[in-house]
Amino acid sequence: AVRSFGAKILLHGDNYNESSKKASSIAKQKKMELIHAFDDPMTIAGQGTIGKEILDAEDNLDAVFVPVGGGGLLAGVSAWIAQQKKKVKIYGVEVDDSACLTEAVKANKRVKLREVGLFADGVAVDQIGLHTFDVIKECVDGVITVSIDELCAAVKDIFEDTRILSEPAGALALAGLKKYASKMSNKKLLAISSGANLNFERLNYIVERSEVGENREKLLSIQIPEKPGSFLKLCRVFGRSQITEFNYRFCLLYTSPSPRD
């Protein structure tokens, strides 16, 4: 889609921060205009039109859930909805291993994360935007964090309902909605789904982790004695619970010989 408008695409780095630094460097060297991915008033305003679309399409909403990376989408949508219908609550949703907004809210100032998880690479940002944070503080009702397992379960939900494969970041808002809905009832909730940039190799991992995210499976790491009957005793502990997969690793501890030996 981008190439169809005549743009040149340069792939650089393994995450957003590396790509952003490269883009800033090129813009400075070639004296070009840099359009920030999220931390620009015009970018925020453009993304805010989604808020208008939501209110035009749905009435009597109780809450809207928005995925958070740098905060542009959340700032734009929350600003529009807050001005139109203040009764609608707005929640940002983050992955717990890249929760830059959550940390900023706790500190009441922008915080730069030391490490950022890359599973939901579409929202893998180490610091919330300056402009976006100013808007979010005024217009957003709360921030919800979800685990990777809960995120994978949301990807599965979208596929089962629509037969559309969402990328992890695209299913983030739904994961937050599900977590919120588990504590509420009789509420009309809406989640923004954005993004389908999913590598095929990730599908198997998502399928496995979604079972954990839906509390259908548990992953256990257990040490048992290396002697006959140990596995049978373990199975008896589980009772009627079903073991869907079992990986066994034999660990032999020994002291390596010294040069003198």
Sequence positions of predicted segments:
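Active-site-adjacent helical/loop segments in soluble small-molecule enzymes
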Residues: 129-187
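Short amphipathic alpha-helix segments
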Residues: 227-246
